[in-house]
Amino acid sequence: MTEPTQTQPAVAADENQIIAERREKLRALREQGVAYPNDFRPTHHAADLQATFADSDKAALEANPVEVSVAGRMMLKRVMGKASFATVQDGSGQIQFFVTPNDVGAETYDAFKKWDLGDIVAARGVLFRTNKGELSVQCKELRLLSKALRPLPDKFHGLADQEMRYRQRYVDLIVTPETRDTFRARTRTIASIRKFMDNADFMEVETPMLHPIPGGAAAKPFVTHHNALDMQMFLRIAPELYLKRLIVGGFERVFEINRNFRNEGVSPRHNPEFTMMEFYAAYTDYRWLMDFTEQLIRQAAIDALGTATIQYQGRELDLAKPFHRLTITQAIQKYAPQYTDGQLSDDAFLRTELKRFGVDVSQPAFLNAGIGALQLALFEETAESQLWEPTYIIDYPVEVSPLARASDTTPGITERFELFMTGREIANGFSELNDPEDQAARFKKQVEQKDAGDEEAMFFDADYIRALEHGMPPTGGCGIGIDRLVMLLTDSPTIRDVLLFPHLRRED
């Protein structure tokens, strides 16, 4: 059976038959000796060659021959009698191989004609330009390094099934340049953040992933068991309380980029395993944090994309402009101006209005909710999705901010912000609560809520209280969702597009 050509989709053929044919080729290779050799070392990468010799014409390359050793995956092959071409893709890009029996020998040439798309091949040769001007390697030595047993998706149709792209990310990376670009941008973003933090005298640290008590956020944890210690443990939902212990210990500026785990739903914005960057700075407050976070995100965009003006889902977002700042009620009245100050202070009205939006106000989290928590819930229904431009929502109520410092001037309010862009939360920060007695009282309130059925309420962390009792300097802290930030910078509509291996349901 002949393997499908570039115009005959592999999906239309009997894939099992194709695999069987390739296994037979592998069997023949094994009989000849080492089927998967590991003694070839490339000297150049495709993209570097394309960039370095972009201005070298045919005559210049002939006058000054450049010897190269290149390896990669064969993505296209054209056999034309006594001369053949192959497009080879390495980790940086693509380059063309030119293969003739005169250069590589008749035996190698005959073998090459039987190689398949997806095979890992290597060549030593010299650079030249074809008559059409394409930079190519005139192969003097050609080798098969790794036999691919499964066919690649058809060139023109690609990996059309979106779930298959996530499930078989390795294939998606092979055939989809945009996917590779997304994850390179992610790497540049994180590298930029690390550089920015280092320049601001922050120390990168690592804190535990297994916690005896989950804390630092309102979320449902994953539960596991430590056999050696015979104790229940939790995958961390946030590193916050450990990082603030380090502030107590005298490390005045710390940050961590790492995984958090929350045993909650999956959506275009949520994955149970996700990457956060949290940082804490002594002798700062939430206003300093807002200025600092704004500068950090702006610089990350410039380093990742070369500009602070980005396109997201067909709309422009200018990160160079100062970010907006609104209170919760200001945001509600901006995007839902029908609400009066009196209505937004009326418990019964707010509960009725939330019911109209389909919110179950009988659930434990709302049973004893005050005006501030109800206002926040209404904000989430009316304004949050409309916050396209970078906007800090500030001054959150105490009852939904158990770790944030209370305002000195406004009762019931904390020095807290959340940063929204394109209708989604990107960051959350506040002046840290460093009063151990106030913190203990708030933990007790959280325990009461948990006992009442609120699974996301926090536990009482006695050791953290003990740390605060040693004295924590005035501190500001912030968490930035790396995945959501990368979604923004790469114009990705779902979080799965920026996770190499997102969580999926088990295959049937």
Curated annotation (Swiss-Prot):
Keywords: Aminoacyl-tRNA synthetase, ATP-binding, Cytoplasm, Ligase, Magnesium, Metal-binding, Nucleotide-binding, Protein biosynthesis. GO terms for biological process: lysyl-tRNA aminoacylation. It comes from the Bacteria. GO terms for cellular component: cytosol. One of its GO terms (molecular function) is tRNA binding. It catalyses: tRNA(Lys) + L-lysine + ATP = L-lysyl-tRNA(Lys) + AMP + diphosphate. Mg(2+) 2 binds at residue 425. The keyword Glycoprotein does not apply. Its cofactor is Mg(2+). It is an enzyme of class 6 (ligase). It is found in: Cytoplasm. Mg(2+) 1 binds at residues 418, 425. Pfam families: tRNA-synt_2, tRNA_anti-codon. Its EC number is 6.1.1.6. Binds 3 Mg(2+) ions per subunit. SUPFAM superfamilies: Class II aaRS and biotin synthetases, Nucleic acid-binding proteins. The keyword Cytoplasm applies. Belongs to the class-II aminoacyl-tRNA synthetase family. Homodimer. This is Lysine--tRNA ligase. It comes from Burkholderia ambifaria (strain MC40-6).
